[in-house]
């Protein structure tokens, strides 16, 4: 995989990681009644973080006219999902949960 693709992906992960407190706060607003729909808040927020990273990466790579192969995407998604525990710890810190 090209180094510029991995670099862009890392930038996307870092940008999104810094917004975990905002993502968590948005998803915890009571008016959405998400607590009635989702029973595991931590995994729900984690899913939103994954979604945000994937979405931003697609936007960033499109803006830079990068062509990403399916095999590269598979590798990047494996890298992303391998960071689940790291993101969970950031979410727990951001939401003051234990």
Please report, for each region that a protein language model flagged, where it lies by residue:
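Amphipathic alpha-helical interaction modules
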Residues: 18-60
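Low-complexity intrinsically disordered segments
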Residues: 1-16, 86-98
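Alpha-helix boundary/N-cap detector
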Residues: 3-7, 11, 37-48, 67-71, ...
């Amino acid at each position: 995989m090209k180094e510029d693709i991995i670099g862009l992906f890392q930038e996307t992960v870092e940008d999104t990681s810094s917004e975990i407190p905002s993502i968590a706060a948005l998803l915890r607003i009571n008016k959405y009644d998400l607590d009635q729909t989702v029973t595991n808040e931590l995994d729900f927020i984690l899913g939103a973080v994954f979604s945000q990273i994937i979405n931003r990466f697609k936007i960033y790579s499109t803006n830079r006219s990068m062509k990403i192969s399916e095999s590269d995407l598979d590798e990047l998604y494996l890298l992303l999902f391998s960071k689940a525990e790291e993101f969970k710890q950031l979410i727990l810190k951001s939401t003051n949960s234990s």
